[in-house]
């Protein structure tokens, strides 16, 4: 399957569920306690990370999506720490504070990358608290495209069927990370994502692939789900829908250090991808890749867009580079600059790619870390070059350019000049081939005003698209 990332910044997601704080005490251990046969850990690091539904929201925000988070918290310092943790990445918390209950906290003691013990601080919330939370969340449905219900069976999501029905009536997809043996609580959901243990807790032991598919289809029919994605650890994922053949996606995890939060990563990547316009098989492939990244980290963690791009390049032959939309490129360029990479940009028709082009693009790439090539679409080439041009359609021209080792991104534009797209992207260095004066280069003034540079490179003499066309015509 060819996998490419959608424009995650367009995703608008609401996460409702059991929020918690994952607290880590970390330090070395070198002796056994004289009081009991247990290791003594000398704590030298304390770290708080949002967990549960809050980790789902952070994953969405890290990918670039817009996310609101609704959950139950206590009136305590832990709630304050949780609020700070999610706001750091731009998540909008919509808490319902329950004064007589603590904010759920999971304290883990780690040494040498191994978890020694976990201590839970929590009390079950009342059913009335869940009713109030879901009612409060209804007001947020008009501002989102996808809702995630992140259920850890702590009381935030007790009976969500009416909430699901209302969301679906408004055209909002509802994804559920389920818990417990009664999937009927989530009736009408767009998609549920049980792991294999959760799935078998509802349908019984799965004896074969055919048995899994039969039982999954039974759940679809019984509870009016549109789809079920069963996550299966080392066996990957299986997607079963009401209107298409099943889809098996093999795991891409190379090393597994910690499965904490892997389910959160799956549903967050699904939600962000679907809200950004990806179809369901694409979203599942992206989620599977994201899960493969996060299990290679220790503790509750998120996956960045850049990590996802690199993993897709490794496992799918798709890097998030190559031919991209303008929106995708704007995001990728922002991330490249954050990594300290120097981005070079050039433009042209590149109708018949020749040795002069290849040499020029190689020179341009040598001036930085990344090279963008903006390509005139077919209509603009015809306006600039006349009838009979372009010889090659824009998708073919871009595909050839994307195949060059020197080129990182190829993006089309429809205007006669690249002024608008250059002004939007503002590379570190804008280059142009030929005998241009710097002041005549489209977008040059804007790049310089933003702190960038403009440079003119020479073309190889005697090589041009026009000359090639004339030579072909003369030899017919």
UniProtKB/Swiss-Prot annotation:
GO terms for biological process: ADP-L-glycero-beta-D-manno-heptose biosynthetic process. Its EC number is 2.7.1.167, 2.7.7.70. Residues 345-476 are annotated as: Cytidylyltransferase. The keyword ATP-binding applies. It holds the Pfam family PfkB. InterPro entries: Bifunc_HldE, Carboh/pur_kinase_PfkB_CS, Cyt_trans-like, PfkB_dom, RfaE_dom_I, RfaE_dom_II, Ribokinase-like, Rossmann-like_a/b/a_fold. ATP binds at residues 195-198. In the N-terminal section; belongs to the carbohydrate kinase PfkB family. In the C-terminal section; belongs to the cytidylyltransferase family. Catalyzes the ADP transfer from ATP to D-glycero-beta-D-manno-heptose 1-phosphate, yielding ADP-D-glycero-beta-D-manno-heptose. This is Bifunctional protein HldE. It comes from Shewanella baltica (strain OS155 / ATCC BAA-1091). The gene is hldE.
